[in-house]
Design a protein with these regions (language model features):
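GH16 jelly-roll
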Residues: 20-22, 41-42, 46-351
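Short, low-complexity, disordered segments immediately C-terminal to signal peptides
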Residues: 22-41
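C-terminal motif of bacterial Sec signal peptides marking the signal peptidase cleavage site
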Residues: 16-17
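Sec-dependent signal peptide recognition
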Residues: 2-9
Length: 351
């Protein structure tokens, strides 16, 4: 009996001791709120940022020509004679006319009218009705020799692509001759909005092989010289006796998404001589054509026009309007599309 009391007292003392040690603690206070964090822009791939929109791909759903070559052997053409007089003879255009400088050759004879206004497209012009795009362009041409009749004429002629889109601006490529001095060629591409045009350009004296200029900028302001792969080839061989008014030459350029190559051939059987192979990089940021290479279809044309600002190099006085109906001869003009490049553009643009 005594042992039972002893066990009871021991258990009571143990419970009392444990009860004193197991005093419940008050609940812990809540943690302080975290400081606000700034939202960091990201790429939208799990980092909590906003997705950066992809740049818009300029696109217009237009009819683009298949391959063609117009040799002007007939009085009519599938090409358009710009601003031609309707219902009567227009002395500015004579298709299938015997050449004044080559035997057994019929040409498109284009005569500039002293009454024509100033500017591209204001003089005689043969131009596609629909559009052309990435591809190879060429024309066999001869410009007039005006140096004895009017040495300070301000007139340009050449092979062009040109269009103005209301949203995206200008798409233009020029292979130009300025007839006050037909020993030089003027190569250029044009993008941007009217009044804010961007250009890349190269001027070459083909009679000597001298590259006079290779630069980029706005319509009338140089931003810098082009170097490295944008200035290739860095030298050009002279073409002995080159004079665009003395004989026909074949002028051309190849237009691709990443490059434009201007070239010349002495005749139908000769190899192309590369005058400029421009490979694009960002020259004009925050524009639809940052590389300076046009990105939209345009119209292909041969044109003869008066300009008081497109001066022949070193001839600042050569800006007079034409005093006589000087003639330009076009033997043929041709276009071969780079269809794979055009199809890729269509596929991307319609997404």
């Amino acid at each position: 009996m005594r042992s039972r009391h002893i066990l009871f007292l021991a258990a009571l003392l143990l419970a009392t001791a444990c009860g004193e040690k197991y005093t419940p603690l008050p609940p812990a206070p809540p943690p302080p709120p975290l400081p606000p964090t700034e939202e960091v822009p990201g790429d939208g791939e799990g980092d909590g940022g906003q997705e950066t929109p992809e740049p818009e791909i300029p696109f217009k759903d237009v009819t683009i020509y298949p391959e063609f070559k117009e040799d002007f052997s007939e009085s009519s053409s599938f090409l358009r004679f710009a601003a031609k007089v309707n219902g009567g003879e227009d002395f500015r255009y004579y298709s299938a006319h015997p050449s004044l400088s080559a035997t057994n050759t019929k040409v498109m004879m284009m005569r500039i009218d002293p009454a024509d206004g100033e500017g591209w497209g204001k003089g005689p012009q043969v131009i596609t009705k629909d559009y052309t795009f990435y591809g190879s362009y060429s024309a066999r041409m001869r410009v007039p020799d005006i140096r004895k009749a009017q040495k300070n004429i301000g007139a340009a002629a050449g092979l062009y692509v040109h269009d103005i889109d209301e949203k995206y601006g200008v798409s233009g490529i020029d292979f130009e001759l300025r007839i006050a001095d037909p020993t030089k060629v003027y190569l250029s591409a044009w993008t941007g909005k009217e009044g804010e045009l961007n250009r890349i350009s190269r001027t070459i004296d083909l009679a000597t092989g001298k590259i006079i200029d290779c630069s980029y900028g706005t319509d009338d302001t140089e931003k810098g010289k082009l170097t490295d792969e944008q200035n290739a080839p860095s030298t050009v061989s002279a073409i002995n006796g080159f004079d665009a008014s003395k004989q026909f030459y074949i002028y051309g350029f190849d237009w691709k998404p990443e490059s434009i190559t201007w070239w010349i051939r002495l005749n139908d059987n000769s190899e192309k001589v590369t005058l400029w192979e421009f490979k694009g990089k960002e020259l004009f940021p925050d524009t639809y054509a940052p590389s300076g290479i046009p990105v939209l279809p345009a119209h292909n044309a041969t044109s003869f026009w008066h300009s008081s600002s497109r001066l022949a190099h070193g001839m600042n006085s050569a800006k007079e309007a034409p005093k006589y109906p000087f003639e330009m001869e076009i033997d043929w003009m041709a276009y071969t599309p780079f269809q794979d490049e055009i199809d890729k553009w269509k596929e991307n643009g319609k997404k």
